[in-house]
Amino acid sequence: MEWHCCEFEHLSAVDLYAILRARNAVLVVEDAHTHLDIDGKDAGALHVYATQRQGDAAEVAAYARILPGDDIDPDVVIDKVLTSEACRDDDTLEHLLERALTAAHAAWPDAALRTHVPAARQAFYKQFGFRKAYGPFLHQGAPFVGMIRPAQRAAGALRQLLSRAVSAQRDRNEEARADGRAHGRLAADSGANR
């Protein structure tokens, strides 16, 4: 299996055709959804996919599309997640999600990630840091839930900021205690000197 991650303009015509064929085979035919898969959002997305050789042609074994956030909806969206029928009993989906999360974090480190998944797959996505945000709701007649994975860098930045604030206060308290011991008095903020 050969893994790829690229923007739309870097997809070859052969790879694009294989991706659209796989998306239609799984998301339209297998899932019995009557919708237009080509929705005009592919040009601005990252495409994470795996190909396998079948004779002379390469077929898409796994695929996920990653849409960037914007001013109205800042969350990055992972959608069109699929694996071919031949890759459903192995760890291909796990590898796909790991690669999609890595690509999304590299491209948009400060953004939360959102996805819509079949309600029965919630536990699987929780393994990757997603939590239920809303739903269930019906999508093409099947129950789905919206899941979100909080931004990691923003959370890390907040932890750093809080840690610095606590450390700075602790340092000021230590300095006041040391100053008080050196001069034989309590720190001014203790209230005992009043």
Task: Label the model's feature ranges.
Residues L97, A119, L138-P143, R177:
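Short glycine/proline-centered loop/turn elements that form peptide/ligand docking sites
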Residues A104-P118:
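Conserved GNAT acetyl-CoA-binding A-motif
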Residues M1-G44, T51-E59, Q160-S163, R172-N173, ...:
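Short amphipathic alpha-helix that is part of the acyltransferase structural core
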Residues K126, R131-I148:
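Conserved catalytic-core motifs of GNAT/GCN5-like acyltransferases
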Residues A43, G55-D56, D71-D73, Q140, ...:
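Short strand-connecting beta-turns/loops that link adjacent beta-strands
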Residues P68-I78, R88, P109, L138-G141:
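A conserved beta-turn-beta hairpin within the catalytic core of GNAT-like acetyltransferases
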Residues Y49, A57-G69, P74-L82:
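Conserved beta-strand in the GNAT
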Residues T83, R88-A103:
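Conserved acetyl-CoA-binding loop-helix of GNAT-fold acetyltransferases
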